[in-house]
């Protein structure tokens, strides 16, 4: 196990995530207990993947929410890895799991262990009795942990749970898109969390910003229309946020 993976394992313990369960809502966990502010915004499929920086002493992670949610979650975990590994400012145009750059390798290993912990993977495989994973195993594993099939297969390879020849064959099938058809046939439903919820809004500001804006509405300092403009949502969404306390999450 690398130092980055051990740090991720320790971080799961610190965040109260245990050593095997999926992360139910990564954004809320990291904003509540990870000490970072996270902003999501649509930048297009070819836009910046994510960045990490500290602004006025506050760690900020900005993520392109245009890609599929499984990619967005990994990018969030990757940027959080830069934060916890002390890498300083990081600007990632793409998240390349095959990168050999030292910082990128560390952030990728951290993200993979945070989202799909080795202990959990082993126990999950044993519960299924899969001696050698096939495409269905990879699809179900990815779905269980809310990651992509590429990440799930990479974890199986990293932890030596799949033979090289089998991995290459599975990689080719994933690149051909067969996993998507299989997921549909198996009736696998996507993880519902802040990432999937906020995609329809286009922009998600950090919780601390949303709290400040809604508090200003409650105090009569600004009206609903102004709040909607500052939060990049419509007035109906502002009403829903106030009613359900979403700015506090």
Q: What are the language-model segments listed below?
A:
Residues 1-249:
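Active-site hotspot residues in diverse enzymes, especially metal/ion-binding acidic/histidine motifs
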């Amino acid at each position: 196990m690398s130092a980055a993976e051990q740090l991720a394992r320790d971080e799961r313990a610190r965040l109260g995530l245990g050593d095997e369960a999926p992360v139910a809502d990564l954004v809320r966990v990291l904003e509540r207990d990870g000490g970072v502010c996270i902003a999501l915004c649509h930048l297009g499929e070819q836009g910046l993947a994510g960045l990490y920086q500290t602004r006025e002493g506050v760690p900020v992670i900005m993520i392109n929410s245009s890609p599929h949610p499984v990619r967005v979650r990994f990018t969030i975990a990757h940027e959080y890895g830069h934060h916890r590994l002390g890498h300083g400012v990081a600007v990632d145009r793409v998240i390349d799991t095959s990168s050999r750059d030292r910082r990128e390798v560390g952030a990728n290993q951290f993200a993979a262990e945070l989202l799909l912990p080795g202990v959990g993977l082993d126990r999950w495989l044993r519960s299924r009795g899969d001696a050698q994973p096939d495409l269905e195993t990879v699809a179900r594993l990815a779905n269980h942990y809310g990651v992509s099939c590429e990440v799930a297969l990479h974890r199986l390879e990293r932890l030596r749970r799949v033979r090289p020849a089998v991995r290459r064959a599975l990689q080719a099938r994933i690149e051909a898109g067969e996993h998507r058809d299989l997921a549909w046939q198996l009736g696998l439903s996507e993880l519902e969390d802040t990432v999937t919820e906020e995609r329809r809004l286009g922009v998600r500001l950090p919780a601390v910003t949303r709290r400040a804006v809604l508090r200003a509405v409650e105090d009569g300092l600004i009206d609903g229309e102004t709040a909607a403009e500052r939060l990049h949502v419509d007035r109906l969404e502002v009403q829903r946020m106030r009613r359900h306390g979403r700015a506090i999450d």
